[in-house]
Amino acid sequence: METRILVVNPNSSKSMTVSLRETIEKTFSMESCKISYFTGPDTSPPQIDGQETSIKSMEACLPLLIDDQESVYYFQKFNGILIACFSDHPLVAKIKDRAAKEKADVSIVGLLDSSINYCNLVGKKFSIITSNKEWIPILNNSVESKFLTGNTVNKNLWKGTVSTDLQVLDLHSPENFQQIAEIIYRENIKKLDSDIVILGCAGFSGLQNKLAKTFQRDGTLFLDTIEIGLQILITMIRFVNSQK
């Protein structure tokens, strides 16, 4: 049976969706999995750079995903949905609530929860690299209040969030790679002593291999949140299907 997945880019930047699609198609076999892509409407912000734009993007996208049963993006037409924004994005909770209310057989995953849960399981020191500075307190608060396990806290494995001081849409520009790499080396690797660096924005998608090669001698694992989010989502779907 074909597995149907919807990847939701909640901002209105089509270039971001194209980048996500390119990364996913390089990483995943599509033989038994059909992946569709949704870009936020024009009323959604072009980039999500904090709480206000997160809420605006949720308000713009949610009706298109849960209200119109004729839409190709209607949530119950999919086995799983990946919200491709690295935050505690309100779309995740809203769609989960609707799915639970209607007893819909669909798994919903966000990039933040899947990444932190992976790091909790691995049990190594980890930190986040993000875009603009506004995200530092937002991500730190979300991680510390909702997603850490007791083991992670007790062993002091969570090291915090670092900003590149770049806007989301600038993260993928080749001319900014050296700046990003220098910040990661100075802050995430040397100062915070991270074994895992979470690439904490969908704008980093596709940079995992380049960063891994750059810091090969340090042995640092760079976690592509799109890749780990999709892997976890597919595993959840397969488990649900195995129980039928």
Swiss-Prot record:
Q: Which Pfam families match?
A: Asp_Glu_race (PF01177)
Expression triggers: Expression is regulated by various nitrogen sources.
Q: Give the intrachain disulfide bonds.
A: none
Highest taxon above the source species: Eukaryota
InterPro entries per UniProt: Asp/Glu/hydantoin_racemase, Hydantoin_racemase-like, Iso_Racemase_Enz_sf
Q: Which family does it belong to?
A: Belongs to the HyuE racemase family.
Instruction: Specify the protein name.
Output: Protein DCG1
Question: Which species is listed as the source?
Answer: Saccharomyces cerevisiae (strain ATCC 204508 / S288c) (Baker's yeast)
Q: Which gene encodes it?
A: DCG1
